[in-house]
From Swiss-Prot:
Its EC number is 3.5.1.88. Gene3D superfamilies: Peptide deformylase. Keywords: Hydrolase, Iron, Metal-binding, Protein biosynthesis. The active site is at E134. Its cofactor is Fe(2+). It catalyses: N-terminal N-formyl-L-methionyl-[peptide] + H2O = N-terminal L-methionyl-[peptide] + formate. This is Peptide deformylase.
Length: 167
């Protein structure tokens, strides 16, 4: 497989609303496996297709310490949520930056797996937080949208400097 280039904030493509996957085929398999390779290479725990400039409703997640619990969510829908939690989240598209984001502690989602089978998943804690974070990407929302305008402005300034240093 191969590594995919990650889009960095403030790239406008991160704000696009993704499209549903209509058919799961070899192209989708390749995207998913490349997304996992990219996520693991960057030491992430989740990645949404829009972050790698693929405008489709695909999420890959692995919150396990041994990186052996891959989860693929295609066309995910949030069915229920309860409780409150939150952590200082980071994002592969906003490197080296973190901010506290309130999230639901428990969620129930419906999605398709790589075989095109629909499944429901009830989860909590870090996996629930990660799924919510990645689902935000599918509708063009970033963790910084939960921050105060002042914190967002500071973060944007840091990101512009970081991007200049990468070039």
């Amino acid at each position: 497989m191969s590594l995919l280039p990650i889009l960095y904030y403030p790239d406008h493509r991160l704000r696009q609303i993704s499209k549903p996957v209509n058919k799961i085929n070899n192209s989708i398999y390749r995207i998913v496996y490349d997304m996992f390779d990219t996520m693991y290479h960057k030491n992430g725990i989740g990645l949404a297709a829009p972050q790698v400039n693929i405008n489709l409703n695909i999420i890959v997640i692995d919150v396990s310490e041994n990186k052996e619990q891959r989860l693929v969510l295609i066309n995910p829908e949030l069915l229920a949520k309860s409780g409150e939690t939150g952590i200082h989240e980071g994002c592969l598209s906003i490197p080296e930056q973190h901010g506290f984001v309130p999230r639901a502690k428990n969620i129930k989602v419906r999605a398709l797996d790589l075989n095109g089978n629909s499944f429901n998943l009830e989860t909590n804690d870090l996996q629930a937080i990660c799924i919510q974070h990645e689902m935000d990407h599918l509708v063009g929302k970033l963790f910084i949208d939960y921050l105060s305008p002042l914190k967002r402005q500071r973060l944007l300034k840091k990101m512009k400097q970081l991007i200049r240093n990468l070039d």
